[in-house]
Amino acid sequence: MRLLYTDTGLNNPLLPVYSLTAAEIALANLNPTIWSPATVDFIKPGVGQKVSALANRIDGGKFNSQASLEPTKKYNGSTLQGINFSGAAGLFGDTPVALNGTINTFAFIYQLPSGALPSTPTDRIVIATQETTPHGVGIRTTSAGSFPVFFNGGSQPDVPFTPSNMGAGLFCAVVMCSNKNTGAYAIAYQRSDQTAVTTRQVTGYTIPAYTTSQKMNLGGAGDGSVSPLTSVLSDAIVIPGLYAYGTSTQDVIFAYLMERIGEITG
């Protein structure tokens, strides 16, 4: 697991502290229409040249524009239809939970074209609600929770999401948790091969109060417990910057996630 962070927030590039992987190089060399306006500049090691992480799938497919992926009402007070996790062990319920102004959780689940639920579009954006209790900030794996989902820019009703209907496709799950009061953001994601993860597709985690030098705790069951993640976890980053809520934040996050997902799937 690797860690990178920036203290400077939204208006500065995120500086990678590692060499580019083959997938990262391939992604940086892509020149499709940029998923406007989402780009993030990175310093290319050994060159001193900024490169853009484009919000496009590594397989060449494209997501819709940022505007079409945003709900009409977002963040504070938002309650949307979502994926129903009730069919998987440890993933119960579909009761909507509203976000609040202090601690928000954001989840991104990326499905490769050959993946599950073939009757619906293959580009999937999942924005998850959060727990408001102090001990369990994060994806609900043991409590009732609704997971709003956007299919190709449009909101659709609950869709069953269980190991039995995942098919042969690979899901990459990304989770972000943020504390507005401290400006602390944490992102965790894992590669959910069905052979390695069968009863949970998004691993729960907790986020303690931390400074820029502290790492977040990953693992657990979503109820405050902390346990080691399995080998399917590919990466984690902590971005303790005072980001403003809204489209600009999502632009930065999504562009970066696309760059990281390129490494996972490429």
Predicted regions located by residue number:
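Extracellular glycan-interaction patches encoded by glycine-rich segments
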Residues: 210-234
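Short, aromatic/His-centered strand-loop micro-motif at the edge of beta-sheets
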Residues: 94, 148-176
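Short surface loop/edge beta-strand patches of beta-sandwich-type extracellular domains
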Residues: 13-28, 84-106, 158-165, 222-225
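Short tryptophan-centered beta-strand motifs in secreted/extracellular beta-sheet-rich domains
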Residues: 106-108, 164-180, 185-187
